[in-house]
A protein has these predicted regions:
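A C-terminal cap/extension of S-adenosyl-L-methionine-dependent methyltransferases
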Residues: 162-216
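Short alpha-helix
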Residues: 139-157, 163
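A short glycine-rich, Lys/Arg-flanked "PGG" loop and its adjoining helix->strand segment in the class I
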Residues: 85-100
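Short catalytic micro-motifs in class I SAM-dependent methyltransferases
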Residues: 76-77
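Class I SAM-dependent methyltransferase SAM/SAH-binding core
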Residues: 10, 14-60
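A conserved beta-strand element that flanks and buttresses the S-adenosyl-L-methionine
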Residues: 73
Length: 216
């Protein structure tokens, strides 16, 4: 598994604990340091399944041979890339035939939802005309449209196999709101999972999870 932009390693470590061989490709040296510390705290068997490389997800060809991975994850990264197509193509190149490319992106088709539901009408109106937005960190980033990414995936030989909505109901929750306790948490996750695979709800989710499969 290649995890591009693993951040603090929540996803990468979970996969390594499940027995997968995981390579993390991270551009931010601060995040690399945090992730190295997290890996060092794991048992030896898990540490042996983790490999960390400091590098840019747009330059996968400089680090890996074509067909090196069965799964490539790129979650929460494309919004920071001005032009996603070259990066997505590079990710697909390092996939083995039949391999899975998993993308998690901001949904440009629902970009007006959060500001609109919050009563921020100027931002909501602007979101209809531009995929650019300011995220919760105060950074200028961009969103992607599902149809556009689906066309990109088809063009690079990893056509879209399935897609889901993420954060249909919970996107307005503030970052400092405590995680619900059981049994509410289980009900919340069940509602999000159901909405994320059901029309029309998934189309207005804050994020899109797109799964492409590399042709043989």
């Amino acid at each position: 598994v290649l995890d591009v932009g693993p951040g603090q390693g929540t996803q990468a470590l979970r996969l390594a604990r499940l027995g997968h061989e995981v390579t993390g490709l991270e551009l931010d040296p601060r995040m690399i340091a945090v992730l190295r510390e997290a890996v060092a705290a794991e048992p030896e068997g898990i540490r042996e399944r983790m490999r960390l490389i400091e590098g840019d997800g747009r330059d996968t060809g400089a680090h890996f041979q074509p067909g090196s991975f069965d799964v490539v994850l790129c979650h929460g990264v494309l919004m920071y890339v001005p032009e996603p197509d070259p990066m997505v193509a590079g990710l697909a190149r390092v996939l083995a035939p039949g391999g899975l490319l998993s993308l998690l992106v901001r949904n440009a088709d629902a970009l007006a939802m959060r500001p609109g539901l919050s009563g921020d009408w100027d931002t909501a109106l602007a979101a209809f005309d531009s995929p650019a937005y300011t995220n919760r960190l105060g950074l200028q980033v961009r969103a992607d449209r599902r149809e556009t990414l689906a066309a990109t995936l088809a063009g690079i030989g990893a056509p879209l196999r399935a897609w889901y909505g993420v954060r249909v109901f919970t996107d307005l929750a503030e970052d400092d709101v405590p995680v619900p306790t059981e049994p509410e948490l289980t009900r919340l996750l069940a509602a999000e999972e159901r909405a994320g695979r059901t029309d029309p709800y998934r189309a207005v989710a804050a994020l899109l999870h797109l799964c492409g499969v590399r042709g043989g």
